[in-house]
Amino acid sequence: MNLLLLAALPAAAAVLCGYTTIRLPVGRKEGKEHIACVGDSVTYGCTLPLFFLRRYPAVLQRLIGSDAQIAAFAVNDRTLQDTGNKPFRKERAFRQSMEYRPDTVVILLGTNDSKDSNWISAEAFRRQYAELIAAYRALSPAPRIVICTPPCAFKPFNRFFYITNDTRLDRVPEIAEAVKTVAAENGAELVDLYALTQGKRELFGPDGLHPNAAGAKRIAEAVFRTLSKSSAQGGKP
């Protein structure tokens, strides 16, 4: 019985992932660089045991150290586009990320936009992404903007883990290309997580969509490299 229960835990976590979001309070500590990690379930750490310690923002915090404060503003199953079924910009997490007055914003959205019910066109996606960037840049002072392509998505191991059967795996590459264009057109820094994870099924959990601990670590390292490059050039953090 215990073995059966243990075997069922990943599936239970996967099922709950799309429907629950635990809000953790974020206190802004003065005298530090403030980095807001904005996103959906990938940023939230969906399906990760002890997600608040193992998701990529937590790993990034350990990589950067005490000079910066990293806060995650993420809600499962949310879309970048306001025309999607669950827009991120209508969430309290978005308002909190603005109130946080970040020095740097790292955005990782787009996977949920791949669903047929949410997708309009690459042009519409790029336009609404530019609007999100503009909203953050309207803050004073304007933060540095880093945007990430969605990571690669894979088929689940079996039907019990297929909680994301409306995600269009074949559309994720198109969205990744759209994000690259957005970065170039809007002067944002880019982290290409799609290229980083392409062909690396071992970096994802049973559902094929959410990174496991190794995948979250790889994402954090990629973001850290971009932030460190900016720092070496005299930027933040």
Name what the model sees in each region.
Residues L132-Y136:
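Hydrophobic positions in alpha-helices of CheY-like receiver
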Residues K32-A36, V42-A130:
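Conserved SGNH/GDSL esterase-like catalytic core that processes O-acyl groups on lipids
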Residues A71-F73, V146, E189-V191:
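General small-molecule cofactor/ligand-binding pocket signal
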Residues M1-V38, V42-F51, Q61-D67, E99-Y100, ...:
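N-terminal secretory targeting modules
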Residues L108, C148-T149:
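Alpha/beta-hydrolase-fold catalytic nucleophile elbow
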Residues L139-R144:
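A short helix->loop->beta-strand "cap" motif at the edges of active sites that frequently abuts
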Residues L48, P150-P237:
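Catalytic His-Asp segment of secreted/periplasmic serine-dependent ester chemistry enzymes
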